[in-house]
From Swiss-Prot:
One GO process term, biological-process aspect: iron-sulfur cluster assembly
Fe-S binding site B, as annotated region: 214-228
Required cofactor names: [2Fe-2S] cluster; [4Fe-4S] cluster
Entry keyword annotation includes Disulfide bond: no
CC terms in the record's Gene Ontology section: mitochondrial intermembrane space
Pfam families: Anamorsin_N (PF20922), CIAPIN1 (PF05093)
Official protein name in the record: Anamorsin homolog
Keyword Iron-sulfur carried by entry: yes
PANTHER family documented for this protein: ANAMORSIN
Keywords: 2Fe-2S, 4Fe-4S, Cytoplasm, Iron, Iron-sulfur, Metal-binding, Mitochondrion
Gene name as annotated: CIAPIN1
Ranges for region Linker: 130-161
Region named N-terminal SAM-like domain: 4-129
């Protein structure tokens, strides 16, 4: 009992009243404080306030589910001391731990000691992980003393500073008229050349297949219509093949 010296208020739970006064006096002497008495069979009917005792001593450990009640009766960091217990110490310690006690141990004199946590049941505490570390927040903070700025002018070469030739900025087919550049590399020059060849071939075919609608074209200009394709050409024999030049079908204006 020497480890309980200085505890002011204790509760002694008894089963056998033989020499009860002697045991109570020994507890008073060891603690130096007040000692209250309670029968183990009347414990469930008792109405003690929470955090009433610094120490609870039990003669018999046959309490079933009353360990939780003892936990509420003890003050924070209060002690629970079991003597003359029945059964295996390991299973009894496990039951006490599950009731909320800590630092449960078996003493050398075949007694068990446990402790209530240093806080009240149902109490809360503010968690520290919610705090923001100010040094972490300043990691990405830009400071003019720590950063070296680069002059933008140093990023440009002399060639970059020269003004470009406006002629070099023109792109094929962007000036309103489809006309290829001098050094065309986009394929527009080849496309225009193919279109020109197709147009000339179509005109050539139209002149070769020209037919007379009036039947008087071979007689000469005096007998030809104003839109005759043979206008201006000498007379020829009927059925004779005549080759027309390209400019005959074009307007003079």
């Amino acid at each position: 009992m020497e480890q309980f010296k200085g505890l002011q208020k204790s509760l002694y739970i008894w089963t056998d009243n033989a020499e009860l006064d002697k045991r109570v006096e020994q507890l008073k002497t060891a603690t130096g404080g007040e000692v209250a008495l309670e029968n183990v069979h009347r414990l469930s009917f008792a109405s003690y306030a929470s955090s009433s005792f610094d120490l609870i001593v039990i003669e018999c450990a046959q309490l079933t589910d009353n360990y939780v009640k003892l936990l509420h009766m003890l003050k924070p960091s209060g002690k629970l001391h079991l003597i003359s217990f029945i059964g295996a110490a390991g299973s009894l310690l496990q039951e006490i731990k599950l009731s909320g006690f800590i630092n449960c141990s078996e003493d050398s004199d075949n007694t068990l000691t446990a402790e209530k946590p240093g806080y009240e049941t149902g109490s809360s505490a503010r968690l520290s992980f919610a705090k923001k570390n100010s040094s972490t927040l300043n990691v990405w903070k830009i400071s003019g003393d720590d950063d070296e700025l680069i002059d933008e002018e140093d990023l440009l070469d002399e060639v970059d500073k020269q003004k470009p030739d406006p002629a070099s900025l023109k792109v094929c087919s962007t000036t309103g008229k489809r006309k290829a550049c001098k050094n065309c590399s986009c394929g527009l020059a080849d496309e225009l050349e193919n279109e020109k060849k197709q147009e000339n071939a179509a005109k050539q075919a139209s002149t070769e297949n020209a037919k007379s609608s009036c039947g008087n074209c071979y007689l000469g200009d005096a007998f030809r219509c104003s839109s005759c394709p043979y206008l201006g050409m000498p007379a020829f024999k009927p059925g004779e093949k005549v080759q027309l030049v390209d400019n005959l079908l074009k307007s003079d204006i």
